[in-house]
Amino acid sequence: MNITGIITEYNPFHLGHELHLKSSKEITNCDGVICVMSGNFVQRGLPALTDKWTRTKMALEAGVDLVVELPTLFATSSAEFFAFGAVSLLNSLNVVNNICFGSECGDIDLIKKLSEIIINEPPLFKEYLKDYLKEGLPFPKARSEALMKYLDDNNYKIDFSYLEKVLNSSNNILAIEYCKSLYKLQSSIKPFTIQRLGADYNDEELSKNEIASASAIRKSIYTSNMEESLDFMPEYSYNLLKNTSFSDLDKMFDLVKYAIVSNPNVLKEIPEASEGIDNKIIQNIGKANSLDELINLCKSKRYSYTRLNRILCHVLLNVNKDLLSLRKSSPNYVRILGFNNKGREILKEIKKNSEINIVNKLSKAKADPLLEFDIKATNIYSFLNPSVKINSDYLISPIIFR
């Protein structure tokens, strides 16, 4: 079987996702699709709009054959760890031939070239990176500047204003990290990319005659009439959303506030909360009335909105240094969220070709700190979304789609 892997959040599943899935099947000419999907918390450092089982149903309705969960520790991390967790999981299955992801540039050769430079770290590139970091630039910006200078020195034929745009676009950044992970793992999986169409990844406004971003759809659902989002989602996705409940960001703020006020040292356990940002959060926690307000009071050139969101999410989930160290290795298990008949065949192939632990039922799973953390994350999510109960991970079986 020719199997394609895709890495998603489906938060929620919209027309852009439907196009990506269809195009991924066409461009790779595959026999089946495995989707690695974030669970109940996502890469922005927020609870998913709706739970992972509802989003699994959306994926299966759309034509994904097998949905597996990206462990929460990777799912709530920066692009580098998010990508490594997802790619290493797909690689460990030993059945995936291709990976297909969206990008703003749609240029797989450029993405691969940039990935090679970053992973190989030529001495001159390292020197430039060091210099830009000394200037106080945040790491992503310093790396972008170092890449541009290195390519310029090596007479790489490219418009540098275009390259700067490439290096500062959300999906391109993830695409580079996916390819970087493939190089790091010496994987035989072949990467493909599809140019992202429609609204920008971070665009929060719905616009007629355009594919909307998930951000805009979530904002519409949270702030106005849900029916506004109908034109931007497949009907099956909309109907599933209509019959479920959504996570409550105000409750998340209350829980984060409680965690920090009751134990200010909780921030010291999170390596990302360094350089005085922990003190800034503590100073502003009493002034803010919402998560958004707290982040806007604390953000700076070095600490972006999303980076702060992830730090606060890790406070909520009580992440510590020992847990974060697990991100350096591939997950030892694959958690099955749902499958169809073809997905059942793919599972048989995984069992034949891979030694990875396949988790269908948690009651039979081997002990694993990443899996235990997922269970805890779902239990915390149950305080934010009334459709999820404590211990839902034990109570809900993989979804079988016929």
From Swiss-Prot:
Q: Which Pfam families match?
A: HIGH_NTase1 (PF05636)
Family of the protein in this entry: Belongs to the TmcAL family.
Question: What are the recorded GO MF terms, alphabetically?
Answer: ATP binding; ligase activity, forming carbon-nitrogen bonds; tRNA binding
EC class, as a word, reads ligase
Protein name (record): tRNA(Met) cytidine acetate ligase
Which residues are recorded as binding ATP? 7-20, 102, 171, 196
A GO cellular component entry from the record: cytoplasm
Its function, per the record, reads: Catalyzes the formation of N(4)-acetylcytidine (ac(4)C) at the wobble position of elongator tRNA(Met), using acetate and ATP as substrates. First activates an acetate ion to form acetyladenylate (Ac-AMP) and then transfers the acetyl group to tRNA to form ac(4)C34.
The lineage is: Bacteria, Bacillati, Bacillota, Clostridia, Eubacteriales
What is the species of this protein? Clostridium perfringens (strain 13 / Type A)
Where does it primarily localize? Answer: cytoplasm
Q: Please name the gene that encodes this protein.
A: tmcAL
